[in-house]
């Protein structure tokens, strides 16, 4: 069994992944024998590319953003022998890496220091969630305005005009423009929420049409901000936050600027923890999982079920 597989998304960030392979080889020279690791570029369909293959390694290091990591977590969740997960955060969204301290280490100390930490292999367990037992994720699920932004980004990023814009501004800058474009988007139907409380009783909440978004999070950081001061990634629970008004949506910006969790600055915020959530609605809206669009779960008459299904080991500083 080999020790490490480095899996690089060549399209991550501003194509940083295309040059990363040589940097990894250089940093590992004299540190780890070349026969103990492999470096590969990921295909778009990672789940098919690496199904039942990752168990051949002790550690799988993903160089990419939250979307790439989510695809690998999807594979790891189904394995009997799960490798440890390492992260080189080079994506547009790096919320998981930010939540566990890897992003700060990478930005402040560089690739060499990060590879050393990965080889030391200090780990923490994080919960893995599923949507309808079909879509597996570790970070967050968004329904509404944030998913509309992700959908627009995915639709536009493959067009030639996007390459022109990308040469002038960063992906995050482009996300900012799309945020302004979708500032008035609302979920156009009523939503019923059923969740299991700490006493294993079912609570039912009805939300009228016109709310901005529903965000289900397992990570401490979501879109660069903290939503909940109570978040733990290994407690078998996840946080549910409902952004009902424009004012609460503006508070998301305050949370970023003030570097404080949203629940500490927004009065009467609808937020709770659970290990099982059911959403019932009839209508069409947008859905994103770990920053990637998933429109299919949010069309027509729907009953969506979110629950914790397993966990995986992630390397931390």
Predicted feature descriptions by range:
Residues 142, 146, 215-228:
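Glycine-rich phosphate/pyrophosphate-binding beta-alpha loops
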Residues 196, 216-221, 243-247:
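Histidine- and/or cysteine-centered catalytic micro-motif in compact active-site loops
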Residues 13-17, 222-224, 313:
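Short N-terminal binding/cap micro-motifs at the start of the first secondary-structure element
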Residues 65-68, 90-93, 143-144, 219-221:
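Short glycine-rich anion-binding loops that position phosphate/pyrophosphate groups of nucleotides
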Residues 18-20, 73-76, 98-100, 227-228, ...:
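Short amphipathic alpha-helical segments
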